[in-house]
């Protein structure tokens, strides 16, 4: 499946919630009618079957983290192999993606922008350049912006924007050095309560 390149707000309207695909300079409800389905007339959302609800939740999380269908299914399979709660394992694996960590640290205003920074070799992990967005970040790994990329306007702007957001408790960031430490894997209580990962588990368990 190809990566979606269309309007980002349309995806958030489709899922009925902010997927954090835009920079966050303005509240998303000031940009579009988030509670209204996409389309010229904002058709009413029909009642979904159990399968439809499960599918929508999977699509919501997949789009939020910017992961393709095949990748997402592979994450689920890995989560199912690990000990503990499969749904929680899935969210933790997604949170450990390098592009997500770069976003969480505030070096990018969106996960898509973070993915681009990683792909363009602007990011280092423990002093080594890593250009794989799906790279798995481990506890105590140090993620930093390469020296030659530190003056990029988008990174400076993203850090200013990040100062307005609540800081993740599992990450420590030194904005002046453009460097952060992934202190630990987040627990379920650290993450969004708007995600119902059990619906995704039920979908893939069929």
Curated annotation (Swiss-Prot):
Q: Where does the S4 RNA-binding domain start and stop, copy by copy?
A: 96-156
What CDD domains does the database record attribute to this sequence? S4
Q: Which domain of life is it from?
A: Bacteria
Short name of one Pfam family: S4
Alphabetically ordered keywords of this record: Ribonucleoprotein, Ribosomal protein, RNA-binding, rRNA-binding
A single GO molecular function term of this UniProt record: rRNA binding
Alphabetized Gene3D superfamilies for the sequence: Ribosomal Protein S4 Delta 41, Chain A, domain 1, RNA-binding S4 domain
PROSITE patterns according to UniProt: RIBOSOMAL_S4, S4
Q: Which InterPro entries match?
A: Ribosomal_uS4, Ribosomal_uS4_bac-type, Ribosomal_uS4_CS, Ribosomal_uS4_N, S4_RNA-bd, S4_RNA-bd_sf
Extract the SUPFAM superfamilies matched here.
Answer: Alpha-L RNA-binding motif (SSF55174)
User: What's in the GO CC field?
Assistant: small ribosomal subunit
GO BP of this protein: ribosomal small subunit biogenesis; translation
This molecule's function is given as: One of the primary rRNA binding proteins, it binds directly to 16S rRNA where it nucleates assembly of the body of the 30S subunit. With S5 and S12 plays an important role in translational accuracy.
What family does the entry list? Belongs to the universal ribosomal protein uS4 family.
Query: Subunit structure, briefly?
Result: Part of the 30S ribosomal subunit. Contacts protein S5. The interaction surface between S4 and S5 is involved in control of translational fidelity.
Q: What is this protein called?
A: Small ribosomal subunit protein uS4
**Which species is listed as the source?**
Alteromonas mediterranea (strain DSM 17117 / CIP 110805 / LMG 28347 / Deep ecotype)
Q: Which gene encodes it?
A: rpsD
């Amino acid at each position: 499946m190809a990566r979606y390149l269309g309007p980002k707000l349309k995806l958030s309207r489709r899922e009925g919630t902010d997927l954090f695909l835009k920079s966050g300079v303005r509240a998303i409800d000031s940009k579009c009618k988030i509670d209204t389905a996409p389309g010229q007339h904002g058709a009413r959302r029909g009642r979904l079957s159990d399968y439809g609800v499960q599918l929508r939740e999977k699509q919501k999380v997949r789009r939020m983290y910017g992961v393709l269908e095949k990748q997402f299914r592979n994450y689920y399979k890995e989560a199912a192999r690990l000990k503990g709660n499969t749904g929680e394992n899935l969210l933790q694996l997604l949170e450990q993606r390098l592009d997500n960590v770069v976003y969480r640290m505030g070096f990018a205003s969106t996960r898509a922008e973070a993915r681009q920074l990683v792909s363009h070799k602007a990011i280092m992990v423990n002093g080594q350049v890593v250009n794989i967005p799906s790279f798995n970040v481990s506890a105590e790994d140090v993620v930093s912006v390469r020296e030659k990329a530190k003056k990029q306007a988008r990174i400076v702007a993203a850090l200013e924007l990040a100062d307005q957001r609540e800081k993740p408790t599992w990450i420590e960031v030194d904005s002046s050095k453009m460097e952060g430490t992934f202190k630990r894997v987040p627990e379920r209580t650290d993450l969004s309560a708007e995600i119902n990962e059990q619906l995704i588990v039920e979908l893939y368990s069929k």
